[in-house]
Regions:
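Short, conserved, GDST-rich strand-edge loop motifs in beta-rich repeat architectures
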Residues: 137-147, 186-208
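Beta-strand-rich domains and repeat architectures in extracellular enzymes and scaffolds
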Residues: 59-102
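Blade-loop segments of beta-propeller domains
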Residues: 108-141, 167-171
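Signature of short aromatic-glycine-proline-rich micro-motifs recurring in repeat-based ectodomains
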Residues: 71-82, 124, 171, 200, ...
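Surface-exposed loop and turn segments in beta-propeller and other repeat-based domains
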Residues: 51-73, 119-120, 217-242
């Protein structure tokens, strides 16, 4: 029997000053115990934000509850990268195992609810938010040499892909500038760590680079791409800016 792998999205609030470790029982003590011990901190005292403390758990959501009807909880799920809508009411997460972009309603952060998912044409590596859209990078590479990927523009309200922007390589991370005018995508073109010829060490081509998207106006069809060459900058492996 396949061993199920569970993932959970943890919703936390923050109060300044010291962080206190959570010692109270949680609904998923057991398979989530390690995650909670490592990542969930809870400030001492009440949960109304009046007492000093740090991060504290106010809710969590098991990603298996956001599977499609009829799908088995034995399916492996991953909640890896999370971004929030600009109104703070929706969380968008990447699930690389299922190749999905999931949505969770945190209007009541103590009682999060799944809102479904968008099935993607590749493995999601990162997600960020610009206005009404989630910007999700996906890896569509055939192998470590023949690399490819796309930036998917997803309408958050309708959960639909409204534009696909080819990136020319395997993307890693995505970030939107604070003024909302640019999106930067790191094209990693990661190395094969099991490559016998190199022992998994760099340099391994193709080289990585940076893609900048000019977020012109509110219509994603007007957005444009620029590529920035990053070779020759680093002292170590300058030909391979992975």
């Amino acid at each position: 029997m396949k061993t199920p792998h569970f993932a959970s999205l943890l919703v936390a609030a923050f109060a300044p000053q010291a962080i206190a470790q959570d010692s109270s029982p949680a609904p998923w003590d057991g398979f989530l115990e390690g995650i909670q011990d490592s990542f969930v901190a809870r400030r001492a005292g009440t949960v109304d934000g009046t007492d000093p403390g740090g991060f504290y758990r106010i809710g969590n959501y098991p990603i298996l509850d956001n599977l499609a009807a009829g799908e088995s909880i034995d399916e492996e799920t991953v909640c890896e990268i999370v971004a929030a809508s600009e109104d703070g009411m929706t969380l968008i997460y990447t699930d690389s195992e299922m190749e999905r972009l999931g949505f969770v309603d945190i209007t009541d952060p103590a009682d999060p609810h799944g809102m479904g998912f968008v099935q993607l044409p590749g493995e999601p590596t990162a997600v960020s938010v610009s206005g009404d859209y989630a910007l999700c990078a996906i890896n569509t590479s055939a192998n470590f040499v023949d690399t490819s990927g796309d930036l998917l523009v997803v309408d958050i309200a309708s959960q639909t892909i409204v534009r696909t922007m080819p990136l020319g390589g395997q993307p890693d991370s995505v970030a939107v500038s604070p003024d909302g005018q640019f999106c930067a995508i790191a094209i990693e073109n990661e190395r094969d760590e099991d490559d016998p010829a190199t022992g998994g060490a760099p340099p391994q081509l193709p080289a990585g680079y940076l893609v900048i998207v000019d977020l012109i106006g509110h219509d994603p069809n007007n957005w444009t791409l620029r590529t920035v060459d990053m070779t020759g900058i680093a002292d170590l492996y300058p030909e391979d800016p992975e």
